[in-house]
Curated annotation (Swiss-Prot):
Gene3D superfamilies: 3.40.50.10210. CDD domains: DMB-PRT_CobT (cd02439). InterPro entries: Nict_dMeBzImd_PRibTrfase, Nict_dMeBzImd_PRibTrfase_arc, Nict_dMeBzImd_PRibTrfase_sf. Belongs to the UPF0284 family. NCBIfam families: nicotinate mononucleotide-dependent phosphoribosyltransferase CobT, PRK04447.1-1, PRK04447.1-5. This is UPF0284 protein PAE0372. GO terms for molecular function: nicotinate-nucleotide-dimethylbenzimidazole phosphoribosyltransferase activity.
Amino acid sequence: MKLEPQIMAIVIGTTDISLIPGISVAGASPELTHYTPALDVEYLLLGMPKTMEVIPVTPEGIPTPALVTRAVAGEVAKLVVNAGSRITPKVPYVDLGGEPGRDFRRGPALSCEAARNILERGRALGCELGRLGCIYIGESIPGGTTTAMAILVAMGYDAWGRTSSASPNNPKELKIAVVKEGLRRVSAPLKPLEAVCEMGDPVHLAVAAIALGVSECGGVPVLAGGTQMAAAAALYKGLGGDLAKLHVATTRWIAEDKSADFMGLMEIVGVKNVYIAGVSFAGSKYEGLRAYERGAVKEGVAMGGALFYALSKGKDVLRLVEAEYERLLSAGVAGNVN
């Protein structure tokens, strides 16, 4: 199916879950994960990061998936949506009146007021975007695969150990232990908003709310992401969304990730419209890109949707991505792996 985006909305936010050592590699250190969403969208829109002088990289120096999104879908209009980021980006953005997510082991992740703001304003934004047609919705939230698992489990889904990781070595045992500790405070299963407030983060709710608004106002929502989008889809469904109108586009690296279960999660939530972008970086001359074939990064910042779109247009994806990576390496802002 040809799903051509009119706008690509990138929802950013942070969760203190990403500060737990070993749980997220979406940043060079746990502390730097709070800068990743802002840096991702600054680079995506401007071509260079602003808040710091380097694009987000893993601890091994593997570049952000925003590199791929910018390289292959640069002509698609982007809209940054701040659901609750600890660091606000130095680019224009829509603010949903949310807040950064807290560590759900210690107490509720979000206030009820922030969650209501995100739902109401995200839905209204989605409705306006939906009038334009097909809208891709991506995300940037380090720690998001853990909070996605937490949301799904809190809502009664069997998602234990089934979400992916930006690391080749998915820290599933750590994630499960963290989620179990948080669940001791609540009586699952919870209703959608309760699950987000207690065990979630601002981003998954915002993605669901925007998708809901898009579908309600005649548009076509495409969740551009991996296993995290199972949580967004579950919230969308739980809030009254029609799953027949929802689409999910992700990467081959997510679909083939044996440490997770992307298709299984889509199945238990009930998502039928799933698209896999079959791209390989195995032939790249750059180690930082070949690392994607060994399980690094996999998804994020709408990369799966961007690749799906680029392939539908017949683009030479690897050539475009290598050219952009070369530009960043020359500028000295692409980390320490080439």
